[in-house]
UniProtKB/Swiss-Prot annotation:
<dbReference type="InterPro" id="IPR001648">
    <property type="entry name" value="Ribosomal_bS18"/>
</dbReference>
<dbReference type="GO" id="GO:0003735">
    <property type="term" value="F:structural constituent of ribosome"/>
</dbReference>
<protein>
    <recommendedName>
        <fullName>Small ribosomal subunit protein bS18</fullName>
    </recommendedName>
</protein>
<dbReference type="GO" id="GO:0070181">
    <property type="term" value="F:small ribosomal subunit rRNA binding"/>
</dbReference>
<keyword id="KW-0689">Ribosomal protein</keyword>
<keyword id="KW-0699">rRNA-binding</keyword>
<dbReference type="Pfam" id="PF01084">
    <property type="entry name" value="Ribosomal_S18"/>
</dbReference>
<comment type="similarity">
    <text>Belongs to the bacterial ribosomal protein bS18 family.</text>
</comment>
<dbReference type="GO" id="GO:0022627">
    <property type="term" value="C:cytosolic small ribosomal subunit"/>
</dbReference>
<comment type="function">
    <text>Binds as a heterodimer with protein bS6 to the central domain of the 16S rRNA, where it helps stabilize the platform of the 30S subunit.</text>
</comment>
<dbReference type="InterPro" id="IPR018275">
    <property type="entry name" value="Ribosomal_bS18_CS"/>
</dbReference>
<keyword id="KW-0694">RNA-binding</keyword>
<keyword id="KW-0687">Ribonucleoprotein</keyword>
<comment type="subunit">
    <text>Part of the 30S ribosomal subunit. Forms a tight heterodimer with protein bS6.</text>
</comment>
<dbReference type="InterPro" id="IPR036870">
    <property type="entry name" value="Ribosomal_bS18_sf"/>
</dbReference>
<dbReference type="GO" id="GO:0006412">
    <property type="term" value="P:translation"/>
</dbReference>
């Protein structure tokens, strides 16, 4: 009987810890590129495009960047064009 009580106590204490951690994590809602005064998605703007590329040179998914599907497609096309025109590297060098 003591073992079952200890197991239930540890399970509840772990559940409380997880719930407490989730309280402090607030995710921004909405697309950062759909707000007023947002920068225009263009292949000639590498400063904007590099924010949506990982350290290894891969395009970040929308679940990480929180960009809507329409803007994500525009970003992907702009990044591809910028790579072809050598405005962005295909693979980033390790520093």
């Amino acid at each position: 009987m003591l073992k079952s009580n200890n197991a239930s106590e540890t399970a509840t204490s772990k559940g409380v810890d997880k719930a407490a951690k989730k309280v402090f994590f607030r995710r921004r809602k909405g697309c950062p590129l759909s707000v007023p005064n947002a920068p225009v998605i263009d292949y000639k703007n590498p400063e904007l495009l590099i924010k949506f590329v990982s350290e290894g040179g891969r395009m970040l998914p929308s679940r990480i960047t929180n960009v809507c599907a329409k803007k994500q497609r525009k970003l992907n096309n702009a990044i591809k064009i910028a790579r072809i025109l050598a405005l962005l590297p295909f693979v980033f060098q390790a520093k």
